[in-house]
Amino acid sequence: MKAVIILGLVLLSVTVQGKIFERCELARTLKRLGLDGYRGISLANWVCLAKWESGYNTQATNYNPGDQSTDYGIFQINSHYWCNNGKTPGAVNACHISCNALLQDNIADAVTCAKRVVRDPQGIRAWVAWRNHCQNRDVSQYVQGCGV
């Protein structure tokens, strides 16, 4: 019985952690997926955005109690506007995607949705972390030494 309890505690302590990209690995992946220069946004800005939104973690989520929405994945894409989690009141789902798809280690769906986000008038300014940490700053460090 004691062994079962210990095993249960061990299993409870295991957290699901998605892929956490290395900076240059992410830069190369985003370039391959067509984000470098997309809508005039440099690759360095995309990598900066991902750093400050999720710490490059594909499984990152953040609940927003105000509107009962959740931000998902490497770009922290919001369930109120962009994806469907089946829980957010009045969700729009402009990317026509399940929010869970934004948590995959393969970030192709997240990139496709991010491209949809920046086609809106706010562009990359839709992300608060980009405005706070990347906008009007030298972001070249985010791709420096990556060969991209």
Swiss-Prot record:
Location of the C-type lysozyme domain: 19-148
InterPro entries assigned to the protein according to its UniProt record, in alphabetical order: Glyco_hydro_22, Glyco_hydro_22_CS, Glyco_hydro_22_lys, Lysozyme-like_dom_sf
SMART domains on file: LYZ1
Molecular-function GO term, any one: lysozyme activity
Keywords annotated in UniProt: Antimicrobial, Bacteriolytic enzyme, Disulfide bond, Glycosidase, Hydrolase, Signal
EC supergroup of this enzyme: hydrolase
PROSITE patterns (alphabetical): GLYCOSYL_HYDROL_F22_1, GLYCOSYL_HYDROL_F22_2
Reactions the enzyme catalyzes: Hydrolysis of (1->4)-beta-linkages between N-acetylmuramic acid and N-acetyl-D-glucosamine residues in a peptidoglycan and between N-acetyl-D-glucosamine residues in chitodextrins
Cystine connections: C24-C146, C48-C134, C83-C99, C95-C113
Signal peptide: 1-18
One Pfam family here: Lys
EC number(s) stated in the UniProt entry for this protein: 3.2.1.17
Record's keyword annotation contains Translocase: no
Any one biological process term the GO annotation gives: defense response to Gram-positive bacterium
Active-site annotation: E53, D71
Alphabetical list of CDD domains matching this protein: LYZ_C (cd16897)
Other observations noted: Lysozyme C is capable of both hydrolysis and transglycosylation; it also shows a slight esterase activity. It acts rapidly on both peptide-substituted and unsubstituted peptidoglycan, and slowly on chitin oligosaccharides.
Recorded family membership: Belongs to the glycosyl hydrolase 22 family.
Subunit structure: Monomer.
Function: Lysozymes have primarily a bacteriolytic function; those in tissues and body fluids are associated with the monocyte-macrophage system and enhance the activity of immunoagents.
Name of the featured protein: Lysozyme C
Protein species of origin: Chlorocebus aethiops
